[in-house]
């Protein structure tokens, strides 16, 4: 007799970010995450991509990574500038840890249409 599982057969859902399974973040929560990136000494990086290519292609940098940046308001203004320039793109904030040479965190700030 074949085994009948009681667990549903759920499809894996692709997510774009670290917090993809949580409710969308508020503006204050986004600011707190950016402040955390800066406090850890990580380099803020802004990336963007059209939604149609978000899973198949590399995301493009908005300018260069902000190495050594300590000003939260400057990072937020660059996020907003990227969103204004590419309103239909996903815009993601990445905290790059130079010591481990990896992403410390990544989350979508603006979702494209």
Curated annotation (Swiss-Prot):
<dbReference type="GO" id="GO:0009853">
    <property type="term" value="P:photorespiration"/>
</dbReference>
<comment type="function">
    <text>RuBisCO catalyzes two reactions: the carboxylation of D-ribulose 1,5-bisphosphate, the primary event in carbon dioxide fixation, as well as the oxidative fragmentation of the pentose substrate in the photorespiration process. Both reactions occur simultaneously and in competition at the same active site. Although the small subunit is not catalytic it is essential for maximal activity.</text>
</comment>
<keyword id="KW-0602">Photosynthesis</keyword>
<dbReference type="GO" id="GO:0016984">
    <property type="term" value="F:ribulose-bisphosphate carboxylase activity"/>
</dbReference>
<dbReference type="GO" id="GO:0019253">
    <property type="term" value="P:reductive pentose-phosphate cycle"/>
</dbReference>
<comment type="similarity">
    <text>Belongs to the RuBisCO small chain family.</text>
</comment>
<dbReference type="InterPro" id="IPR024681">
    <property type="entry name" value="RuBisCO_ssu"/>
</dbReference>
<dbReference type="InterPro" id="IPR000894">
    <property type="entry name" value="RuBisCO_ssu_dom"/>
</dbReference>
<keyword id="KW-1283">Bacterial microcompartment</keyword>
<keyword id="KW-0601">Photorespiration</keyword>
<keyword id="KW-0120">Carbon dioxide fixation</keyword>
<keyword id="KW-1282">Carboxysome</keyword>
<protein>
    <recommendedName>
        <fullName>Ribulose bisphosphate carboxylase small subunit</fullName>
    </recommendedName>
</protein>
<dbReference type="Pfam" id="PF00101">
    <property type="entry name" value="RuBisCO_small"/>
</dbReference>
<dbReference type="InterPro" id="IPR036385">
    <property type="entry name" value="RuBisCO_ssu_sf"/>
</dbReference>
<comment type="subunit">
    <text>Heterohexadecamer of 8 large and 8 small subunits. Forms a CsoS2-CsoS1-RuBisCO complex.</text>
</comment>
<dbReference type="GO" id="GO:0031470">
    <property type="term" value="C:carboxysome"/>
</dbReference>
<keyword id="KW-0113">Calvin cycle</keyword>
């Amino acid at each position: 007799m074949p085994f009948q599982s009681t667990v549903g057969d759920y499809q894996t859902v692709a997510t774009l970010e670290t917090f993809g399974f949580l409710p969308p973040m508020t503006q204050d929560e986004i600011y707190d995450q950016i402040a955390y990136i800066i406090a850890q000494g990580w380099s803020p990086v802004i990336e963007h991509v059209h939604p149609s290519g978000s899973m198949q292609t590399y995301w493009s940098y908005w300018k260069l990574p902000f190495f050594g940046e300590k000003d939260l308001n400057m990072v937020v203004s660059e996020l907003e500038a990227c969103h204004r320039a590419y309103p239909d793109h996903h815009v993601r904030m990445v905290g790059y840890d130079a010591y481990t040479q990896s992403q410390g965190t990544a989350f979508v700030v603006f979702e494209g249409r």
